[in-house]
Amino acid sequence: MKKTEKIKAPLTKGVAKVPVIMQMEALECGAACLAMISAYYGKWVPLEQVRADCGVSRDGSNARNVLVAARSYGLEAKGYRFEPEALRTDGQFPCIIHWDMEHFVVLDGFQKDKAVLNDPARGLVSVSMEEFDRSFTGICLMMEPGEQFAPGGKPKSVLEFARHRLK
C-alpha cells in the first residue's frame, strides 16, 4: 500500500469488498475470517500465522482468541451481542459473526433483502434475511484499524497457494 493511500474505514451501509480467504481445515474459520478483515484494511497476514495467533486447536478457536489476535495486529476489536435487525441498522461492516452455533463468517453487509457473507468454507454467498435470522447466533466481532495498525504484506499468489497445499 502506498503511503498516500488512506486506510479504509468500516461501512455502516452497503457491502464491503472483502478479499476471500478460504480456510484450509474445518477448524480454522475464525482465523480465516480475521485474515479477511485484516486484508480488507490492508494488512495481509499469512493464514498459517493467523492460525497460530488465534490459538486454533482441535476444537477450533473462540471469539476471545480472535479478538486478542486482532488487537495484536493493531485492530480495535470488540465483541457484541446483536439482534439480526439491530445489526443491519447499527452494525459496521465488515465484521465477523458466529453462524449456526459452530462457524464464523465475515458479514460484508446487507443488500436489499439479503445478507452478503464471506464464508471461509464456501466463498462469497448471499442469504435471505430469513436464513440470516435463523443462523446468526447474535455474536458479532467488530474491528477497525487503531493507531498501531500498519498496512503491509501481500496476498498469496495462486502458485504459492497450490505449492503449499501440495507439500
Predicted regions, residues:
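Membrane-integrated ABC transporters
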Residues: 1-167
